[in-house]
Amino acid sequence: MHLKNLSLLNYKNLKTAEFDFDEKINCLVGNNGVGKTNVLDSIYLLSFGKSYFNPITSQNINHDSDFFVVEGEFKKNDKAEKILASAKKGQKKIIKRNNKAYEKVSDHIGFIPTVIISPADRDLIIEGSETRRKFMDGVISQSDQSYLNKLLQYTKLVSQRNSLLKYFAANNTFERDTLEVYNLQMSSLGQDLFEKRKEFLKEFIPIFNKRYADITNNKEIVDINYKSQLFDNSLANLLEENLQKDMALQYTSVGTHKDDLSFEIEGHPIKKFGSQGQQKSFLIALKLAQFDFIKKISKVNPILLLDDIFDKLDENRVAHIVALVATDELGQIFLSDTHAERTEKVVKSSNQSYKIFKL
């Protein structure tokens, strides 16, 4: 699978742009602020139906316009697939496949498997549990539509239960039967999500460990630990046991929406004990493991977006990463950098076809 061409209209700072891509490696070079990252983000948009960097659609429209259109033609299983994403201020975002609009944007997720590696990934280490859950859910969802649907249902139920708890507090009332309806549905869906996450991590963590060892030449031991309240109790019991607490807080304090991943190096949290270089290697291994996992499950090479990959990494390390991906039936890579010569030196060493676009 690869992206053949891309056209942008009023997407972020890019008023109009068109690209015909190489099916192997594509390099976007230019000074900071010219829109390299926004081109990569537009490809991510065509894959996920949303921006990687700013999920608020209206803020991705060029300041001088009230709409954007992003269109790409992909080749998948020897068939042309045209994907279009458009948005207008005050209106619902539209995602189309071959001129037919999806009823739900979520129905498109997984059709164009894509992995992005970006300096913004550091949030996975320094931010709260929600960021890491989103990563885990994103990897699973690209290869399991049923999981995504259950996750969306569960998230909606949590929001509705929270609204009910606020209603109880505001009106000094309590309706156990109504609450039980939410508890039952949440318990079933939450348990399913928990089991799927365990199953996923059992397969994902060895892939991640191998990637980290490849990148660092086996320098240190890293691990990912799944933290969930459901290891100790069923969600049904947890909801019942924490009812008074939830009533006081006016939100749901227990469930799979509180799960987290603990990223560790030599048995300690990498956030506190890992150097910048170790953290960067950890994140890249995480994303390359995502690439490997999706490829294994979907039998399709994901598109790989490398945003500002030279940030905190030297040329040799970047060349090593490109080579790692290139060794095993390369998919399509998009790479952004400020230095054309440095970029060309790295991609030449991969012995793959490439194009360089100067923005």
From Swiss-Prot:
One of its GO terms (molecular function) is single-stranded DNA binding. Its main location: cytoplasm. GO terms for cellular component: cytoplasm. Keywords: ATP-binding, Cytoplasm, DNA damage, DNA repair, DNA replication, DNA-binding, Nucleotide-binding, SOS response. Coiled coil: none annotated. It comes from the Bacteria. One of its GO terms (biological process) is SOS response. It is found in: Cytoplasm. ATP binds at G30, N31, N32, G33, V34, G35, K36, T37. HAMAP family: RecF (MF_00365). Belongs to the RecF family. The RecF protein is involved in DNA metabolism; it is required for DNA replication and normal SOS inducibility. RecF binds preferentially to single-stranded, linear DNA. It also seems to bind ATP. This is DNA replication and repair protein RecF. It comes from Christiangramia forsetii (strain DSM 17595 / CGMCC 1.15422 / KT0803). The gene is recF.
